[in-house]
């Protein structure tokens, strides 16, 4: 789903960074796949893809499928990975990640990479 927005090299980096179950590491993930260099408009496009139900938020069930948006042959996040991802991104505690929270998360994680 992110094809056309991300380069093939970025998609390959996502695959390499998270291939094994339990290997999704939120610290620096976005930098590894090049998202930290994206503009605000590009990040909004990515957010809209991840927000499958188009409600304006990425909920836990959508977050679980986040890696699959990079490439269909990638895996779903484990429950533990999904909960850690949600906890890191849900700054207002409403159980979902809004577009502004998503941008802040990319900034935070990209800066660590």
Swiss-Prot record:
Expressed, tissue-wise, as follows: Muscle (at protein level).
UniProt keyword annotations, A-Z: Acetylation, Allergen, Calcium, Glycoprotein, Metal-binding, Muscle protein, Repeat
Sites bearing N-acetylalanine, chain numbering: 1
InterPro entries for the chain:
EF-hand-dom_pair, EF_Hand_1_Ca_BS, EF_hand_dom, Parvalbumin
Q: Where does Ca(2+) 2 bind?
A: 90, 92, 94, 96, 101
Q: List the Gene Ontology MF annotations in alphabetical order.
A: calcium ion binding
First and last residue of the signal peptide: none
EF-hand domain residues are 38-73, 77-112
Alphabetical list of SMART domains matching this protein: EFh (SM00054)
Q: What is this protein's record name?
A: Parvalbumin beta
> Which organism is this protein's natural source?
Gadus morhua subsp. callarias (Baltic cod)
